[in-house]
């Protein structure tokens, strides 16, 4: 159990850093699409790769903890369902007073965002599965470029991983407490909240994602609750004045807790492995409930009260 938690602590923080970095790197004036799309693409490719790879993990049952940390921990923290829902809402809401558009374009914005993201997620997942099947051919002559990872973790390695996860977490906490850079403080809070969100998602999946259930209720609950909390955290600084520290905390909750608690890579993998009828029902329920939450929480505030503060 401690080994699993150590893996998840490290992987969730690395996934959060990778998501923030990829999003920032691909967010620039004139970008052809949102930086969040690259995050979903990379996470789903890695998720698909780990599903079919047989050289690095020749005995999946013995490497189950490490595989779980990569797929559920890293990929689940890298991709995000709640931020996608909020992005769909902000694209539809038409809140920019200087670039008003017709209601029909708002509808097209929602449809476009949904279709493009789902197509990228599913196709990249399948592509990752195809790449995973080729690892046995990663060689030039007799030189192989893929080696099996040890199936059993030595007790010394387990202790080192536990200490590393503690040091990583404590280091992020101390840096967040003493830094004066607002951006760094927000990223620090994101790192602090991410392990708690990843472990919450893990235990929700263990208790509520039984094959006996019609749909994976654990992933559904994680995605819906994360979307609800993200909508609230996005709305608060838009309607009331917040101190720089409180804004950093809310930024950390949005990008550390909510974005990590929700996941698109696991969601896409579940859709790919489920029977077609159940997959469509699961997808419709997840998107409809989550997007409705964004509309109710943020839409009612934006169109009724109005956003008076610049976030």
Curated annotation (Swiss-Prot):
GO-annotated molecular function: fluoride transmembrane transporter activity
InterPro entries for this protein: FluC (IPR003691)
GO CC annotation: plasma membrane
Substrates-to-products reaction catalysed: fluoride(in) = fluoride(out)
Membrane topology: Multi-pass membrane protein
GO biological process terms on file: cellular detoxification of fluoride; fluoride export across plasma membrane; fluoride transmembrane transport
Side of membrane Extracellular, spans: 26-29, 87-106, 176-186, 234-250, 300-311
Main location: membrane
Domain of life the protein comes from: Eukaryota
Cytoplasmic face of the membrane: 1-6, 51-65, 128-154, 208-212, 269-278
Glycosylation sites noted in the Swiss-Prot or TrEMBL record: 181
Transmembrane region(s): 7-25, 30-50, 66-86, 107-127, 155-175, 187-207, 213-233, 251-268, 279-299
A Pfam family recorded for this sequence: CRCB
Tagged with keyword Transport: yes
Intracellular or extracellular location(s): Cell membrane
UniProt KW keywords: Cell membrane, Glycoprotein, Ion channel, Ion transport, Membrane, Transmembrane, Transmembrane helix, Transport
Biological role: Fluoride channel required for the rapid expulsion of cytoplasmic fluoride.
Family: Belongs to the fluoride channel Fluc/FEX (TC 1.A.43) family.
Name of the protein: Fluoride export protein 1
Organism expressing this protein natively: Schizosaccharomyces pombe (strain 972 / ATCC 24843) (Fission yeast)
């Amino acid at each position: 159990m401690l080994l699993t938690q150590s893996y998840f602590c490290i992987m969730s923080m690395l996934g959060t850093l990778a998501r923030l970095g990829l999003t920032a790197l691909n967010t620039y004036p004139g970008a052809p699409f949102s930086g969040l799309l690259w995050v979903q693409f990379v996470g789903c490719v890695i998720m698909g790769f780990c599903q079919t790879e047989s050289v690095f993990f020749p005995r999946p049952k013995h490497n189950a903890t490490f595989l779980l940390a990569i797929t559920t921990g890293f990929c689940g923290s890298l991709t995000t369902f709640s931020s996608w829902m909020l992005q769909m809402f902000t694209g539809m809401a038409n809140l920019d007073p200087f670039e008003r558009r017709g209601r029909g374009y708002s509808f097209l914005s929602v449809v476009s965002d949904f279709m493009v993201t789902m197509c990228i997620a599913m196709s990249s997942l399948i592509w990752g599965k195809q790449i995973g099947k080729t690892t046995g051919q990663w060689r030039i002559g007799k030189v192989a470029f893929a080696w099996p990872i040890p199936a059993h973790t030595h007790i010394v390695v387990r202790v080192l991983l536990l200490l590393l996860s503690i040091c990583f977490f404590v280091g992020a906490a101390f840096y967040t407490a003493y830094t004066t850079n607002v951006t760094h403080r927000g990223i620090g809070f994101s790192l602090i909240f991410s392990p708690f969100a990843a472990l919450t998602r893990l235990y929700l999946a263990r208790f509520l994602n039984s094959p006996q259930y019609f749909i994976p209720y654990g992933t559904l609950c994680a995605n819906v609750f994360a979307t609800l909390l993200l909508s609230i955290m996005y709305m608060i600084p838009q309607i009331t004045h917040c101190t720089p520290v409180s804004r950093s905390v809310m930024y950390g909750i949005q990008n550390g807790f909510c974005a990590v608690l929700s996941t698109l890579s696991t969601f896409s993998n579940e859709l790919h492995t489920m029977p077609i009828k159940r997959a469509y029902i699961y997808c419709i329920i997840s998107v409809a409930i989550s997007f409705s939450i964004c509309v109710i929480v943020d839409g009612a505030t934006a169109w009724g009260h109005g956003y008076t503060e610049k976030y």
